[in-house]
Structures are given as C-alpha cells and as structure tokens.
Curated annotation (Swiss-Prot):
This is E3 ubiquitin-protein ligase rififylin. Residues 24-37 have a biased composition (Polar residues). Its EC number is 2.3.2.27. It comes from Rattus norvegicus. It comes from the Eukaryota.
Amino acid sequence: MWASCCNWFCLDGQPEETPPPQGARTQAYSNPGYSSFPSPTGSEPSCKACGVHFASTTRKQTCLDCKKNFCMTCSSQEGNGPRLCLLCLRFRATAFQREELMKMKVKDLRDYLSLHDISTEMCREKEELVFLVLGQQPVISEADRTRAPTLPQAFPEQQAFLTQPQSSTVPPTSPGLPSSPAQVTSVLAQDQETQQAIGHVSQDHEEPIFLESTARVPPEDETQSVDSEDSFVPGRRASLSDLTHLEDIEGLTVRQLKEILARNFVNYKGCCEKWELMERVTRLYKDQKGLQHLVSGNEDQNGGAVPSGLEENLCKICMDSPIDCVLLECGHMVTCTKCGKRMNECPICRQYVIRAVHVFRS
C-alpha cells in the first residue's frame, strides 16, 4: 500500500493484506476438543456393595458408620438402633477388640478401611491393618457409655457405687455421721478407747492383728504375666536381646522375625514361609549365645583377662563382643554386628562402608 502523503515511493509499515482466493469459503474457528455429542450425564447413585442403581431416593440408605450409600438388602437396622451396612455391622459386633479383629479376614479389613477412605498401600502385615481399624473406631453411643463394667467379687462396694444413679453431685448426709462439734469430740474419744482396748488384747494374747486394706496385692501369676507382656512393646522394634529362651521364637510374628534378622544384618530374601524365618532366627540366637559363652568362659579361666589368641577374635571397636560381621565392599572383618552398623568407613582401609553382613561361624 502506498502512503497517502504523496502516493509515491513512500511506504507505510503495515503489511499488505493478501485477498482470499476466489471460491474459498471462510471457516469459523473450531475447538479441537469440542464434541458435537451431548455431554454424559453424572453417575447415578448406586449401592456401594452390590452396585445396584437406586430407582428412587427412598431405596437409598446411608450407613451411619462409613457414610456410604447402600440398598435395603446390603444394610440392616436392629431395633431402634442406627442403620449400618453389613460390613460395619460385623465390625461393631467385635466391639473393636484386638483379639476379635485378628480373627477376621484380611480382605474384610481392607474393605472396611477403604469404606472409611483410609489407604492400605503401605500395610504389609495383618497387624498393621488391625492397628488402623482400631484408630478408626466409631463414636460410642450413650447407652454404651452409661453401662457400668462388671467388677470381680472382691469389690462389692465399688460395684454398688457404679450401679447407683447419680442424681446429684452433692451426696446425702448419712445418719451415722456426727453433725455437731460435741459429737465429733465424743466419737474421737470412743475411737481412742477402742484402740487402747485392742492394744491390751494383742499384748495379752501375743497375736498380731492385721487390718484389711482396700488395695489388693496381685498374685505371682499375674505379676509374671504382666512382665511377659511388657517384654515386647508394640511401638518398639523387636530385638535379639528380648529373647531369653528358644521357645520365645515361636511366639514371634513374621514382622518381628524380619526385624530381628534385619537388625543383625541377616538376609532373609527368598524366605516364603514363617518356619524359614524361624530357622534363621534360631541359628542366629544359638550362634550369638555360643560366642558369648566362649568369651565369658575364657575370661573366667584366665581371671578376667582375655588370652592373646582369643583377643584376635574380639571386636576392635568395643573389645567386648566377638567379630561376627563383614564390611562391604572392602571385606574386612574387624567389628561385631552392633559396631558394624555404626561404621561409616572401615577402620582399617578407610573405605566407605556400603553395608554390613552378619557371618555365621561354623
């Protein structure tokens, strides 16, 4: 286009528009993601268990526990209680006790947790699923809260106190209690006279009098059971020092067996059954006890001093435990398992320690 000033040689900076060719039709802008088909309708509400679509909202029932929708067949209501789905009803029947939850199938535990939108991807053991279920307990109803626990016959007074309705916070005054200062002084004088009389009787007959106390001393069986239960704390990892006898290995779970082997750098890959893990833990326990008896026996024979021949087999870090660990990649055997897992570099060649492996002595 020529400029309008002189209509000659002066060009403006605008590009020249090319006219469209003849016969070409102008096409409107079209979105490639647009579809001429109608948009799909939202998913119809259906039962979470059987997948049946609800024809009407009257057939849709909401579980009070997991807040999911179920049909009349997959939900139940006992008396005037809340309506629950069949799976939540089964879990409520266990009263969320750990022993009862361990008897349930793994599939039911995972289904219950998925209903409550709890991920189970990192759970490898059944105990982990039970732990998550225990942390997802529903709210206890008022009837369960006011229900008094059953106490043994040794506490009849406490049982009667729990069963009495608490109408007011202020207890009623009993007729046997003194209400005036004069009666209080008379009661104290009577108590002193009775104590003196009891003292004279005990001196005459030389028989000690034992007063009954409200605190009950637990028998020896109960104290032993408590000590045995405290030996394995749920929040703490299992260790080889927790075992006192070979019979204790049979009571360990698969997770505890793997923890013991991992802490002592024993490879358990390829073990598909529990008895294979138990064999490796048993061998580790016997090997550890044998080395400890060997060191302690030689020290006792030499009067507390370790002989020069045995000193070569002791850990060069702590000089207390025998050498039962090899450092990789250098391959030096200079430490015990306890010191080997703390080494960043080999104390001999200063090479970086990738990992430590437990070695069984033949």
